[in-house]
Amino acid sequence: MAAAAYEHLKLHITPEKFYVEACDDGADDVLIIDRVSTEVTLAVKKDVPPSAVTRPIFGILGTIHLVAGNYLVVITKKMKVGECFNHAVWRATDFDVLSYKKTMLHLTDIQLQDNKTFLAMLNHVLSMDGFYFSTTYDLTHTLQRLSNTSPEFQEMSLLERADQRFVWNGHLLRELSAQPEVHRFALPVLHGFITMHSCSINGKYFDWILISRRSCFRAGVRYYVRGIDSEGHAANFVETEQIVHYSGNRASFVQTRGSIPIFWSQRPNLKYKPHPQISKVANHMDGFQRHFDSQVIIYGKQVIINLVNHKGSEKPLEQTFANMVSSLGSGMIRYIAFDFHKECKNMRWDRLSILLDQVAEMQDELSYFLVDSAGKVVTNQDGVFRSNCMDCLDRTNVIQSLLARRSLQAQLQRLGVLHVGQKLEEQDEFEKTYKNAWADNANACAKQYAGTGALKTDFTRTGKRTQLGLLMDGFNSLLRYYKNNFSDGFRQDSIDLFLGNYSVDELESHSPLSVPRDWKFLALPIIMVVAFSMCIICLLMAGDTWTETLAYVLFWGVASIGTFFIILYNGKDFVDAPRLVQKEKID
């Protein structure tokens, strides 16, 4: 078994050092961080000075370097999600960011302002819901991956053995990672969604668990991170695992989602739906092959379910994806194109059964992972469904929940929980739990990528589309529009800073946060507001003749509308764009 991370910790603070004391039974270790030299050493409890200010903490997230120097990030509150095979799983709910420096007197005014902004970015990421950890169980690996490991792997610390794709505090833990003797203080933290339920069908009790692991490679927000990078990492890549634990038997079904794996972008420009751009110069096949080579190594066979529209602005993406699969010619990859919106228009969501019937035989071939109560592997999952739409959120989640239910039906029948001929959909109590969990999963993934809850969750929760659901989709769509255009630059910068895609250099002569604005940025909105206001005033305060009033209204109306279209034409100058890391522009 892996060396567990310490669960109970105390933080002792003095002006010169941070002392992190392990309080687990039998533990005598104390991690010492020198606030001046930043040196990390290991000591024993008797070395903690009695004058130190003491407080309990629940984990070390890591350290980060900002303009003012280093900061220590610790978990101060946690909430128990449940237990996975008798291992407690926690959600971190609050953090504290502690400066190594005692004063900021060494900083200039500009540096002070930059440091304040960087701290706001760090706190923004920490405020995002969905950070999970366990001090005794490896949450970053699927059941199947954990079953195929060597004895040496099982002896490693949680940090050493973790799948680095899903360790969101990997950059913050880089200093602790370099010193194996302190690894029990280093807590790998996953970002995504976890829910656990104790369920009963036919008087038989089993645990049902849903885990979504969000990749920290090519992570970001909706419109600024699309497609793949040169290493083949896809934007918004999420591995979702559904686990059943019954009478010592363990079963799991794994699916993935990720952006269409070619080089494309969709930069916000004030339009409701910016036109996606496919690069004309990038080597798509190189990135595409890198992506699927790694996917096949990790997961096996790939069944791609592409849910984008087959007309309009999404059509070129679907055609390019299909052509890339055909050109690659791999027997390990199968491609299914399903125009979700066309097939399900007019709220005909029952037509999703067409897709399920189409892939049923493939799903049976891929199977699922099952290990019996004696620890013997009964079946392996030989591949995954890789689903995507444009955002890999709303349409994708609907399909994933249906595929997962079909797999769960087979698992529960094999384990003897369901009788022969019994349908999972007929188990009202469990069905309610199942649908709500998948809807919550959809909302979590959507908030982390798009900034709002998911669309279409009324179908996931109830099995049908509702008028209230359509209204909520409209509200979330408007909220997404605002965030994607006017706050996502800051969100993207925050993620890049947290993950180490950008490193702060306090000696940098020019502040990266200082971006000069064109005259249009201030002048055009003011002109539009003034013109629109004058138009309203002219309507309310009629002139001597109706022709005079009409002339004034037309003049100011044309001025306001004209200015609006000029702003729309120059939309990219008005959106909140990232400042720290230059994102690809494929225009």
From Swiss-Prot:
Which principal EC class is assigned to this enzyme? hydrolase
Q: In which tissues is it expressed?
A: Detected in brain, lung, liver and kidney, and at lower levels in spleen and skeletal muscle.
Q: Which reaction does it catalyse?
A: a 1,2-diacyl-sn-glycero-3-phospho-(1D-myo-inositol-3-phosphate) + H2O = a 1,2-diacyl-sn-glycero-3-phospho-(1D-myo-inositol) + phosphate; a 1,2-diacyl-sn-glycero-3-phospho-(1D-myo-inositol 4-phosphate) + H2O = a 1,2-diacyl-sn-glycero-3-phospho-(1D-myo-inositol) + phosphate
A Pfam family found in this protein is Syja_N
Alphabetized UniProt keyword annotations: Acetylation, Endoplasmic reticulum, Golgi apparatus, Hydrolase, Lipid metabolism, Membrane, Transmembrane, Transmembrane helix
The way this protein sits in the membrane is described as: Multi-pass membrane protein
Instruction: Return one GO MF term.
Output: phosphatidylinositol-3-phosphate phosphatase activity
- Topological domain (Lumenal) residues are 542-548
Identify the residues that the record assigns to the SAC domain, covering every copy: 122-451
Location of the region described as Essential for phosphatidylinositol-4-phosphate phosphatase activity in the Swiss-Prot/TrEMBL record? 452-587
Question: What's one GO-annotated cellular component?
Answer: endoplasmic reticulum-plasma membrane contact site
The UniProt entry's GO biological process terms, in alphabetical order, are: exocytic insertion of neurotransmitter receptor to postsynaptic membrane; phosphatidylinositol dephosphorylation; vesicle-mediated transport in synapse
Q: Which domain of life is it from?
A: Eukaryota
- Give its E.C. classification number: 3.1.3.64
Q: Which residues lie on this side of the membrane: Cytoplasmic?
A: 1-520, 570-587
The record's subcellular location field reads: Endoplasmic reticulum membrane; Golgi apparatus membrane
Sequence positions bearing N6-acetyllysine = 456
Q: Where are the transmembrane segments?
A: 521-541, 549-569
**What function is annotated for this protein?**
Phosphoinositide phosphatase which catalyzes the hydrolysis of phosphatidylinositol 4-phosphate (PtdIns(4)P), phosphatidylinositol 3-phosphate (PtdIns(3)P) and has low activity towards phosphatidylinositol-3,5-bisphosphate (PtdIns(3,5)P2). Shows a very robust PtdIns(4)P phosphatase activity when it binds PtdIns(4)P in a 'cis' configuration in the cellular environment, with much less activity seen when it binds PtdIns(4)P in 'trans' configuration. PtdIns(4)P phosphatase activity (when it binds PtdIns(4)P in 'trans' configuration) is enhanced in the presence of PLEKHA3.
What is its quaternary makeup? Interacts with TMEM39A. Interacts with SEC23A and SEC24A; this interaction is reduced in the absence of TMEM39A. Interacts with PLEKHA3 and VAPA and/or VAPB to form a ternary complex. Interacts with SACM1L; the interaction regulates SACM1L phosphatidylinositol-3-phosphatase activity and translocation to endoplasmic reticulum/trans Golgi network in a malonyl-CoA dependent manner.
Q: What is this protein called?
A: Phosphatidylinositol-3-phosphatase SAC1
Which species is this record about? Mus musculus
The encoding gene is: Sacm1l
